[in-house]
Amino acid sequence: MSKQKHSASSGRWLKEHFDDKYANEARKKGYRSRAYFKMEEIQTKDKLLTPGMTIVDLGAAPGGWSQYAAKIIGDNGQIIACDLLPMDPIAGVSFLQGDFREEAVLDALLERIQPNMVDVVMSDMAPNIAGNNSVDQPRAMYLVELALDMCRQVLATNGSFVVKVFQGEGFDQYVKDVREMFKTVKVRKPDSSRARSREVFIVATGYKG
């Protein structure tokens, strides 16, 4: 992609962002990001979160999902969050900055988690976009595969998984893989997700262990 095209695309994203009612509402209410509303919509439909839960949040920064989840799970719950980028503190959230694709970071993350004791794994991870779908889609699918592998390592029986996935090559097979591991799997497109975005959210419940 040329710099001119990339600049035009970036400019369009910025205009959409500042015109977007969800982004504006997030700023007004002091929410970390518009992602707060995506998790709120998923929770309204699927009731994944309950007080006292233990949650792992991958790709957490700037903290929209953790911020919403912390409100639901309360003081008796805990959230272990991880991201490459820094994240301002959130009460009830233990944050680890680093790339969990690296063994040392993954080990540090797992040290904070009791095996098979996590109630929900949630992942809003996305790769740095190159503007070339043949590059971007495999990168995105690699991240969601890692998130699914995290479920295998830490999720309790009957636990839940919510993950952002971009539709494209590998998507259908990924949904099949998730269905093999969970009793119920739904694909959600929240109203707060931009219509032209290929992102959807897989909501899986009843981890078979």
From Swiss-Prot:
Record keywords: Cytoplasm, Methyltransferase, rRNA processing, S-adenosyl-L-methionine, Transferase
Superkingdom: Bacteria
One Pfam family from the record: FtsJ
Compartment(s): Cytoplasm
Binding annotation for S-adenosyl-L-methionine: G63, W65, D83, D99, D124
Catalytic residues identified in the record: K164 (proton acceptor)
Catalytic activity: uridine(2552) in 23S rRNA + S-adenosyl-L-methionine = 2'-O-methyluridine(2552) in 23S rRNA + S-adenosyl-L-homocysteine + H(+)
InterPro entries per UniProt: RNA_methyltr_RlmE, RNA_MeTrfase_FtsJ_dom, rRNA-MeTfrase_E, SAM-dependent_MTases_sf
EC code: 2.1.1.166
A GO CC term attached to the entry: cytoplasm
Cited function: Specifically methylates the uridine in position 2552 of 23S rRNA at the 2'-O position of the ribose in the fully assembled 50S ribosomal subunit.
Protein name as catalogued: Ribosomal RNA large subunit methyltransferase E
Lineage: Bacteria, Pseudomonadati, Pseudomonadota, Gammaproteobacteria, Vibrionales
